[in-house]
Design a protein with these regions (language model features):
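C-terminal motif of bacterial Sec signal peptides marking the signal peptidase cleavage site
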Residues: 18-22
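Bacterial N-terminal signal peptides that target proteins for export
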Residues: 1-9
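Lipid interaction determinants
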Residues: 24-86, 97-144
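Hydrophobic helical h-region of N-terminal Sec-dependent signal peptides
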Residues: 9-17
């Protein structure tokens, strides 16, 4: 009987622990991505120029009163920091997915974005694994 009570105690403790742990809300994800005054991230998001050359992004997220949506700027560059193009976008997080609505009508979706330390992770809708690094300051791109 003592053994059964012991197992019941363990089972109830596990259930209680699981019920108190929850998934991150859209607002929490948004704040992790945009911070209080905006955050800039750098890395590869799976984009290429028309000739197949990889493009890297300096992408800045800012939010207003609500941290689950806001506006942003993306500077796509070549690896040597030569500027390819600058894009403006609106962004929002819905049900854990990050939607970027570019001013040219293109929508880019990042599934289950997360922030761990100085890194932003997510999966693009085409399966590309995104890993961006947080950079101090709003834009550190070398002006070539």
């Amino acid at each position: 009987m003592k053994i059964v009570k012991h197992y019941w105690f363990i089972a109830i403790a596990l259930i209680t622990m699981i019920s108190f742990s929850s998934c991150e809300s859209d607002e929490e994800r948004g704040f992790d991505i945009s911070g209080l005054y905006g955050k800039t991230w750098w890395g590869e998001m799976g984009f290429e120029d028309p000739y197949g050359e990889r493009l890297y992004s300096y992408i800045t997220f800012t939010s207003g009163a609500f941290p689950d949506h806001g506006v942003g700027t993306e500077e796509r560059c070549y690896y040597d920091d030569e500027l390819y193009r600058v894009y403006k976008f609106d962004w929002e997080i819905q049900n854990g997915w990050l939607y970027l609505y570019y001013s040219d009508g293109y929508t880019f979706i990042i599934e289950y974005p997360s922030v761990s330390g100085r890194y932003f992770y997510g999966t693009a809708e085409d399966g590309f694994e995104i890993r961006l690094e947080w950079v101090d300051g709003r834009s550190i791109r070398k002006k070539v």
